Design a protein with these regions (language model features):
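C-terminal ends and interior cores of transmembrane alpha-helices
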Residues: 81-102
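Intracellular juxtamembrane helix-capping segments at the cytosolic ends
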Residues: 114-128
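Short amphipathic helix-loop junctions that connect adjacent transmembrane helices
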Residues: 25-46, 241-245
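Cytoplasmic membrane-interface "Motif A"-like loop-to-helix N-cap segments
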Residues: 71-83, 130-131
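A gly/Pro-rich, aromatic-decorated transmembrane alpha-helix motif that marks the paired
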Residues: 25, 63-64, 146-163
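Hydrophobic core of transmembrane alpha-helices in multi-pass small-molecule transporters
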Residues: 89, 100-115
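Intracellular loop-helix junctions on the cytosolic face of multi-pass helical membrane proteins
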Residues: 1-4, 129, 157-245
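Central cavity-lining transmembrane alpha-helices of secondary-active solute carriers
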Residues: 48-70, 116, 150
Length: 245
């Protein structure tokens, strides 16, 4: 069997994916819908440029969020902080005014950086002593990802188009908030997993770190390649999509 904590993570991730994909399903439609119908009347090119920039940044910030969790605040607090920021961001988009849309997207980018990498880190630490069960655990976990994505696209998309854009964005924000509350009030079920940053855990244990368990397994060449790829990707993001908006 699997620990009960896995199912807390399952539903937390499911509602986060509901919120994420629900908002994504609405964003381009909202931006390109005529002003008389409540949208912004953007061209497809401009709407997709903003969407692409947002999506790109969402996959960059987890590098920083994972580092902060490892070094300073621990996985569990990172998840809670990220979920709160994302809930505020999505709910602010329900105001459908330029300031709130841009602020909401920015908050979602920042919050996702804390949330995304640390959910899977908690699972990895939960199964540290039972690695043979880890594949099954991640299979169950990603079932929650798929379920949340499907429900979010269907429900938020329908509500946004048929009832109102603000209701669609608001629904995504409400479920993000529910996911955060569920995780926060059930987190004691994880015991000490993710409670402290990895650096503090290693220091407290006073155990020698084996070569395969080092916090930084990368060689100097690996780091150089990572930096080059990251800089090249960031330059492309800043010079291509933004130039079209």
């Amino acid at each position: 069997g699997h620990p009960a904590g896995l199912f807390v993570l399952f539903f937390t991730e499911m509602w986060e994916r509901f919120s994420y994909y629900g908002m994504r399903a609405l964003l381009v439609l909202f931006l390109t819908t005529a002003i008389m119908n409540g949208g912004w009347g953007w061209s497809n090119e401009n709407a997709l440029a903003l969407y692409g920039t947002y999506t790109s940044m969402v996959y960059l910030t987890p590098i920083l969020g994972g580092f902060i969790a490892d070094r300073y605040i621990g996985y569990r607090w990172a998840v809670v902080i990220g979920a709160i920021i994302m809930a505020i961001g999505t709910l602010s988009m329900a105001m459908i005014e330029p300031f709130y849309i841009y602020s909401g997207l920015t908050l979602l980018i920042v919050g996702n950086g804390f949330f995304k990498p640390n959910m899977t880190s908690i699972i990895s630490h939960m199964y540290k002593d039972h690695p043979e069960k880890k594949d099954g655990a991640f299979t169950i976990f990603y079932m929650g990802v798929n379920a949340g994505a499907f429900l979010g696209i269907m429900l938020c998309g329908y509500i946004g188009e048929k009832v109102g854009w603000n209701w669609g964005f608001g629904l995504a924000g409400i479920f993000m908030l529910l996911g955060m509350l569920q995780f926060y009030f059930a987190q004691n079920i994880f015991g000490d997993v993710g409670k402290k940053p990895v650096k503090a855990v290693v220091s407290d244990s006073k155990a020698e770190v084996k070569s395969e368990d080092k916090l930084n397994p990368f060689t100097s060449l690996d780091l150089i390649i990572i930096v080059i790829i990251s800089v090249a990707g960031l330059v492309w993001i800043l010079n291509d999509p933004y130039s079209k908006v």
